[in-house]
Structure formats: structure tokens, C-alpha cells
Amino acid sequence: MCTRYIPPDVAAIEREWHVGRHNQPDWARDMHPLYTGPFIRLDAGKTRELVVGQWGMIPGDSDTRIPMSKPRGPGEKPKRISTVNARTESVHSRPTFSSAWRQGQRCIVPAASFFEPNWESGKNVWWRFKRADGRPWGVAGLWDQWTDPATGEIVPNFTMLTLNANAHPLMKRMHRPEVDPKTKAPLPPEKQDKRSLVLLEAADADQWLNGSVESARALVRLTPVELFDAGPEVQASQGGLLL
């Protein structure tokens, strides 16, 4: 599950995907859930466009742009839910994501780098993931639009897709190990559900954005480990700059 990433600048997006901002608002330089960031989708004419929207899908019947669960019984209060990631195994059936999936509202989320927690030392150490060739990542995603019932504002929003990474030599090392709810002992590796973002090559952009559901699913695969430049996050001594 990814909850932080760094978007590229607009020049890098134009070079990689041949699409520009075209009067879109600016975006956050360090993305966290519910921040505003860029994503690439097809417009009504099936042409790529760069859109700026909220990271975190908003349920269509939500009263607020903060994703909340619906009360299940009398006296139960809504709870905030996480919609920044969607599992490819269940995206077709989850209420927040299924409509966008069925309607082919697929997008690409540009990322210069993203971050995942590593617990091998017994505590959380954030790792940063870049491409070894210096190009930006293209993260497979879904998009939607939500209309604010109070103001009528249309809010584009998006999520990133994930898949199981138990077999990946790098991504299986990320995230806190799951434990047995009864014994509290770590589950064996084959019982863990390690996750990875679905990462697309630029050459596959048209297939992802404009292909059938079947052709899009063919792109849901783990990324070869040699494409990664990954390691513990390093901050400069001045200003907390990421290196």
C-alpha cells in the first residue's frame, strides 16, 4: 500500500507521455492521501489529457470529499476509509471502484519516486523507489469525478492499483509482517499479502488507457527488479531535502 509519492514536474510528464498541463492548477510536490496531484486520462475525444485531482477516490454518494464509510446501524458514526490504493483482485466488486473499472476509467499516475515502509530492522524505515534509468514511473490507476452537493464543484479524483508481491524479490520485503490474530506470531511468507503498485511502461500507455478490460488486465504484472533503484530514504542535513 503506497501512501506517499513525489510527482514529476510538468516537463518530465510531457517528455514521457506527450501530454501537458494546459491551464490545470498546480499540484503538491510531496503527495500524501487527499492531496492534489496529476494523472493522465483520455478525454471525450480519446485524446490524452493531464488532469489534476484528489488522490483518494470519493464514493459517489459521499457528502464530503473525505472518503467515509456509511453507518451500518443506528448510532454508528461514519468512519474515514482509505481509497488511495485499490486491489486489482477485487477492484471489480468494491463499491468505491467498481463503476470506474467497468466504465474503463483507467488512468496513469506519474511518479518520480514512491515510498514504502521496510520493517526488517524491527522498526519502520522508509524506502524510496525510483527507476534505475531515471525516467518517471507510470502507476496504473482509476479515476472518477465527484460533485460536491453543497457547492456543485466537480472534483476529479483517482486511486492507484496494487497487486500481490509475495513472489517479488524486492517488494516482498516491504511493509510490516502480518501476524496471526490469535497467537500474534508473524504469518509464514506464503500467508502474507505483500503488495506492489502496478507499474506501466510508457509503451503500454495506450493499451492501458484505451484497451479492453482484458487487455488492461494483461498489464497487471510485477515489475522486473532490475528496473528499480531502491533504498532507505536519505534526507540532506539542510532543509530536509530528499536525496
Predicted regions and their residues:
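Short linear sequence motif anchored by a di-proline
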Residues: 1-243
